[in-house]
Amino acid sequence: MGSRETPSSCSKTLETLDLETSDSSSPDADSPLEEQWLKSSPALKEDSVDVVLEDCKEPLSPSSPPTGREMIRYEVKVNRRSIEDICLCCGTLQVYTRHPLFEGGLCAPCKDKFLESLFLYDDDGHQSYCTICCSGGTLFICESPDCTRCYCFECVDILVGPGTSERINAMACWVCFLCLPFSRSGLLQRRKRWRHQLKAFHDQEGAGPMEIYKTVSAWKRQPVRVLSLFRNIDKVLKSLGFLESGSGSGGGTLKYVEDVTNVVRRDVEKWGPFDLVYGSTQPLGSSCDRCPGWYMFQFHRILQYALPRQESQRPFFWIFMDNLLLTEDDQETTTRFLQTEAVTLQDVRGRDYQNAMRVWSNIPGLKSKHAPLTPKEEEYLQAQVRSRSKLDAPKVDLLVKNCLLPLREYFKYFSQNSLPL
């Protein structure tokens, strides 16, 4: 079974079904889906599925109530309390809002933790924290080829049933609670239209003014169409599986434009439409006859040409990266034009400074992953930058890749073993 320490051995032919459609239909809609899903998933035996669907029949003693998160099962089973009145993450009864993915509540501190962890990914392409409670440590990895979610041992044992983690760990292939056609596993009940719920939760509870796009079901995801300005990011897109080497008409597309001086709206409309627009200042040490601010203004101009129509519902993302060349005034201007604050990304391994970039983007998760720098940290970073005449392209590519990982929730990706740069 795949975990953060154990690579997945599951067959990558599992078919993903439209679970939102099944969840919003009749109460019996899961029955035909169960049969269809099992037939289309030969790597997953029926008895393996039963393991994660069963709730523990072990009786709970009313005279010895448990503590901590163990209270969740006790309150639901013994005290008959609605699980919506209990925080799924910590077990407190001080519920602030609803959990967006599963039936249950969230207290205020856990709500903040959930928002911060929602779109954080590790280098292996999977989410960094548990999908339910946002804890780290050793996690079960969903082995559906189109899923990036992980779950902690404690959540599956408490919410599905004691011993569930051991049974999952013994399975050759495990598919998670958001991918299975069965909406209930023990106390864990997937919400209907959970992608809508997730967007509404982020837009309502998030600290920033920028809304996110609803994540896209795997079977609806389309190949991404990218416009890359000033720098070619084809290697990054291939490493993420968005572009295939020698890709035909079925793969993603990339339009690279190095000099946009004479580009006008009709050019962009002819090349497009696009799902992602990327731009950056020139790398440190590069010979260039234009000031760094020129790249920002040109990026903003081209971005206006590429924006979808206002009534369009398709996800559209943009990202502008500064190789720490913009002055303080330029940074303020960029924030005003792009209408979002910058985030500073650092690649520090041990005590060795590798690279850093400032990023303005509407891609979700960036602000929670990279906290603002203190003035002392900013001064140290600038000193490190001045000491390097030129940053290696692979190190820049790694930072770009980390920014684009959340887009796997929106667009089709192809190669399963393409993540390392």
From Swiss-Prot:
First-listed, main subcellular location of the protein, grouped into a coarse class: nucleus
Zinc finger (PHD-type): 127-183
Record-linked PROSITE patterns: ADD
UniProt keyword annotations, A-Z: Differentiation, Metal-binding, Nucleus, Spermatogenesis, Zinc, Zinc-finger
Residue stretches of biased makeup (Polar residues): 1-14
Compartments in which it is found: Nucleus
GO biological process terms, semicolon-separated: autosome genomic imprinting; chorionic trophoblast cell differentiation; DNA methylation-dependent constitutive heterochromatin formation; epigenetic programing of female pronucleus; genomic imprinting; male meiosis I; methylation; negative regulation of DNA methylation-dependent heterochromatin formation
GO molecular function: enzyme activator activity; enzyme binding; zinc ion binding
One matching Pfam family: DNMT3_ADD_GATA1-like
Tissue expression summary: Expressed in testis, thymus, ovary, and heart.
Region of interest (Disordered), residue spans: 1-39
GO cellular component, one term: nucleus
Zinc finger feature spans (GATA-type): 86-116
The name this protein goes by in its record: DNA (cytosine-5)-methyltransferase 3-like
Organism field: Mus musculus (Mouse)
